[in-house]
Amino acid sequence: MKKTAIYFFTLLLLFVSACKSEKVPNVSNAQVYTRVTFNRETTSATTRINQYFSDKYRKGAFNGVVLFAEKGNIVFEKAFGYSDFRKKTPLTTNSVFQLASVSKQFTAFAVMLLKERGKLSYSDSVRKFFPNFPYENITIRQLLTHASGLPNYMYFANDYWPDKHKLMDNRDMFSMLQNNRPEPYFRPGLRYFYSNTGYAVLASIVEKVSGMPFYKFMETQIFKPLGMENTFVYNPQNPLPMNVAEGHNPNRAPVGFNYQNGVVGDKNVYSTVEDLLRWDYALYKAQLVGQECLTEAFTPAFKNLRDDHNYGFGWRINEKDNIVYHGGWWDGYRSYIVRSLGDQRTIIVLINTAQHVPFHLPDLEELF
């Protein structure tokens, strides 16, 4: 994975059908899977990785938590810097971060789970669940693969949301779409265009189909069954846990209130590096959904995209090198996960500053 997985990790930093499986456990008897067995043996990779990130930290160019793993075993794990710069609270490997767009893979997985349960089909139209949805012929599959053409709520909300001191949520986003009908970017299915709106719509579909708030569905159907004890979807009615790292601006001041923080599905999953490793492990073991379903999620959806820029269900894909990956940034946080499916090597980096991250291919090639 030295030159392939690291390449796509660097790329992220620079640019930021039936499924078959065993029966999915119900909420009442959900199995908590055995935690990943961690192996912290000192290796030459440990020394290289530690020196690299330590140098970046000393130069003020990195503040976050890093985890490198192989087949579920930790090769390197370390926290660098502060959770809160004002209070000088140190980060730990148990610090919780906003995952930003890395959240999309969890939203996609929720849809996959409901599909396996026979509750929906990827070919279903959004209007099947929301008859008054103002755009025709948009399917769940198109939402999953960013082919819907929906306008970006992060832009049109600036025009239509009247009180920027009040939090908006998914229902408010739907109301703005319905009342104002902002122009779509293209007709559904025409091409790929990354869509935060599409994944927020998917979260609302999960709520509609399951009869549960999105945060509760994710907690009871995914996070708890997989033993992800420090992972949750943001709910403004619940205070954030004490171990949530503060998001910071480039000048290391805390990021203030953002009225769009109430929208979920495209962002707003919070997690730790070790919980993300449990997630990684669950995907390799095809827990909760079957391997056929995961294979479809990791299959490129577009024939005309460059291989390293293709997309599946919540994951960017490099089919040639058998790598899936995603990055995210939002309100003082950056997040990155790279999974080499062949040799089961995984890189997870969570950052709580919005500054440019100076990672370059020549520096990273030999780390892992």
Predicted regions span which residues?
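Short, gly/Ser/Thr-rich active-site loops of penicillin-recognizing serine hydrolases
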Residues: 21-22, 40-43, 354-368
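Short, well-ordered beta-strand elements
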Residues: 336-353
